[in-house]
């Protein structure tokens, strides 16, 4: 009975804590994206939410284990249940073993998902969502104003249907001045009669009758592969820290915490240390 109770409490509180932390982080992210959310299709937005919450709930499992372990030990001490356990010859070691069962469950699941749930996949989903918004944005650029989206700055004096006239276009080190500009979709811009100015080391000016610029050609495939590998390393470290913080949380909560504030202080300390470890690993990659 005690084993089942501990399993239920730790699993429920760990998942709930991890999910709440993922929602807090999501709220901060949505605050940054608030100016573009209304233009994103509902289906794509929901897909982003699912991927985000799946990854960050997984990522915050160590925090969930830390807090749920401290809360469980605090509950046992506040209710004087430890003395009851001792009277039935249930030792600290046996309680530790009971707590280890849900911990091992989380550890094994986290290890199995370490190559699947990746931070870079969340970033890719966000970029894909913004790319679809970009399609709508560039197709409806108003005339007479300077507008920017990501690394692109665009201005046109007039608009006729899908064609912009007397256009100014800047992307990174490339500036294009053209009489006509049409957005073809999928990141492709088609210019007619104008000038291309590049700014790599020296300025180069080239006149053209027709010029096509594909923004996707500037995407770096090797960089994405590198980030995928880095995401896997972060997951491995995250999983590897689980046994340490579970053991420390159980031991400290059982032996050294006697007042309400001490539980929160030690739990907060362990969470900060865990995030510092992840931060340092990311800096080293």
Curated annotation (Swiss-Prot):
It is found in: Cell membrane. It comes from the Bacteria. It is a multi-pass membrane protein. Keywords: Cell membrane, Membrane, Transmembrane, Transmembrane helix. Its main location: membrane. The chain crosses the membrane at residues 7-29, 49-71, 95-117, 137-156, 232-254, 259-281. GO terms for cellular component: plasma membrane. InterPro entries: LptG/LptF_permease. This is Uncharacterized protein aq_539. It comes from Aquifex aeolicus (strain VF5).
